[in-house]
Amino acid sequence: MKIKFKIWIETDDGKPILGKGGVKLLENIRSTGSIAEAAKNVNVSYKFAWEYIKKIEGLLGGIETKKGGKGAGGTMLSEKLDKVIEIYQSAEKEIEEVLKKYEEKLNDVTTNT
């Protein structure tokens, strides 16, 4: 048996900001420098990715876009946004480690009955 979980970062009034899918998109933007390429890599539309980027920029800041087309434009994440992603990933990893311990306990109980 497994214990599963999902985590996300939300505003104080409960609006989701960043979860697993958002982190994947932002990591792809960081590595490619392209919203279009990142959207393709994570199987979302360019429109969805662009709207998500605008939302993140409005709530957290830290995204710099340069217009210019092929070879001249690009998108970069700030150090602040890199830190937010790092905090999210650290929390996710710690929770996974804790849940593994509880899975072992659960499996001990369920297989020894």
Language-model features: locations:
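Short, Lys/Arg-enriched N-terminal segment that forms or immediately precedes the first helix
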Residues: M1-G14
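Short alpha-helical "packing" element that flanks the helix-turn-helix/winged-helix DNA-binding module
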Residues: L25-L26
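Central "turn" residue of the DNA-binding helix-turn-helix
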Residues: N43-V44
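Helix-turn-helix/homeodomain-like alpha-helical modules used for DNA recognition
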Residues: V84-T113
